[in-house]
Amino acid sequence: MNIYTFDFDEIESQEDFYRDFSQTFGLAKDKVRDLDSLWDVLMNDVLPLPLEIEFVHLGEKTRRRFGALILLFDEAEEELEGHLRFNVRH
C-alpha cells in the first residue's frame, strides 16, 4: 500500500490542498476544486487503490480550519472498506 503524505506546514488553504492533491495523483488542475469533486475522485476509481493518505503537522487550530476535509477523508475511509487508510498526525 502506497503512502501519500500532505504536510500542512506547507498547505495554507483548501485550494492549496486541492492543487497538491491533484499534482500528487497526476490529475488535471480542474479535476479537484472543492469537497464535492474531491469526493467524486475518491469514490470513482480515479486513484491507485489501495492507498494510505496521511495529513501531518496538523495542530488544533489547523485541524479546525481543515475540519471538513478531515471529515471527508474519514467518511471515504469507511466507504472504501480497507482500500483507503487515512491518518492525521501532529
Curated annotation (Swiss-Prot):
Pfam families: Barstar. CDD domains: Barstar. InterPro entries: Barstar, Barstar-like_sf. Belongs to the barstar family. This is Uncharacterized protein YhcO. The gene is yhcO.
